From Swiss-Prot:
Domain called FERM: residue spans: 5-295
Biased composition (Basic and acidic residues): 376-400, 483-492, 506-525
Any Pfam family the entry gives: ERM_helical
Gene3D superfamilies the record matches: 1.20.5.450, 1.20.80.10, 6.10.360.10, Phosphatidylinositol 3-kinase Catalytic Subunit, Chain A, domain 1, Pleckstrin-homology domain (PH domain)/Phosphotyrosine-binding domain (PTB)
Chain positions with Phosphothreonine modification: T564
Membrane topology, record value: Peripheral membrane protein
GO biological process, one term: negative regulation of cell size
Gene responsible for this protein: RDX
Name by which UniProt lists this protein: Radixin
Organism annotation: Homo sapiens
Amino acid sequence: MPKPINVRVTTMDAELEFAIQPNTTGKQLFDQVVKTVGLREVWFFGLQYVDSKGYSTWLKLNKKVTQQDVKKENPLQFKFRAKFFPEDVSEELIQEITQRLFFLQVKEAILNDEIYCPPETAVLLASYAVQAKYGDYNKEIHKPGYLANDRLLPQRVLEQHKLTKEQWEERIQNWHEEHRGMLREDSMMEYLKIAQDLEMYGVNYFEIKNKKGTELWLGVDALGLNIYEHDDKLTPKIGFPWSEIRNISFNDKKFVIKPIDKKAPDFVFYAPRLRINKRILALCMGNHELYMRRRKPDTIEVQQMKAQAREEKHQKQLERAQLENEKKKREIAEKEKERIEREKEELMERLKQIEEQTIKAQKELEEQTRKALELDQERKRAKEEAERLEKERRAAEEAKSAIAKQAADQMKNQEQLAAELAEFTAKIALLEEAKKKKEEEATEWQHKAFAAQEDLEKTKEELKTVMSAPPPPPPPPVIPPTENEHDEHDENNAEASAELSNEGVMNHRSEEERVTETQKNERVKKQLQALSSELAQARDETKKTQNDVLHAENVKAGRDKYKTLRQIRQGNTKQRIDEFEAM
């Protein structure tokens, strides 16, 4: 029994380990990976490995894994990556797993500066990445510093601007807030729709020379072959769509492209190494096949996948709508609960006030009762005093009578009696005056007593009214809410050729009519322009890269990816090949 070989495959978001047999082919391993991750759009992907010379190479599916120059490690290391890119992500990427893998791979390429991205666009893309990771912005959860541990912008962008982490976060957060209600998978798609308009997106660059020996770049992508000057990977100078090419071949380091136009000469260039020509051939065949497939009606399998994806998306939208509805109900119930609590507090406060008023009224009643008793006692004292004075007056009257009688009897002592009489008369007058005053005082105390009695009765009535008033109603109860392979050929083969068929193709150069995503959205376009102006104020001009300068020139000239594409394909094939030879 042959000993199994351990293999580790790293996807963009997972690490898979398998044990394979010595006779396992590249396709068998590839099939095992896509089955494990649940991927059906297999034509975009491949398995990448580092060979014994340190070069990054794609695993050939039609050969045994052990017959290929994989660096000897235990386990054998492979990366599962997108090898071919779609023309339009929103039309071609069907499954959510495919969208996520592309999103993660493109995001990594932008952050590593393998794809040049201008600063303002990098901020917009970062906000979509944040929405995809965190969902809707919530100031209660996403406190200042919530993005501190996230790698969201290329290091080049951070180093070129005199902005703090907090200032970058603020700019990303502003756009994050605008994405409210956007599903996480839709955020990934919006990211890719913006990213696919970047000039270096989906391009495989190869160093080549023309017959003159001029060093140039060959760009192979989903739309065709483009030629770049050696110091400018952003703006291609000549372009050949796949629909103009009928045959591609190489012999050692010489690569020959035969156009469909029989009048046009062969398009010839030279690569520094044979292995590069093998890679170019494999990428040309794969991209051409996908280019043709897109321009033909969908296969039954693709139609089924699209229908299933639509159904899954519809189901997610329904679930989201239901969650939003439940969330709103919960918020309404919370607000209602808060309102009831508030009203309850208000009623308790009112009840407290009534109790305080009652206690105050009771105290006033007690005070008035005390005063009434005091007044009554004063009245009694005044009455008793008046009675005493009356007795004294009578006694004086009697004494007066006795003295008068005595005066009559004793004429002898008339002077003495007259003096006594005068004295008693004066005393009587004083007593009369005192009696009168005491009677007035008694009357006054009588009035005060009546007034106090009336106040007492009135207070008793008020207290009776307060005590008999119905208690405040209890708060109502809170009701909870219801809640594809292309063999790069054997390493020993120094030549190879492939015919590229263009039969049955509809509207084969539709890509030339495209506009960028920001051109479609005026609001985003203006926001990007405003942010670009704002960032220019904080930019350190001494740290500008060659790509920054080239990008600024393109913006100034009004060029974008698709305008450039139309321009570099102008004229017939012969004219463009002649132009290439003259470079």
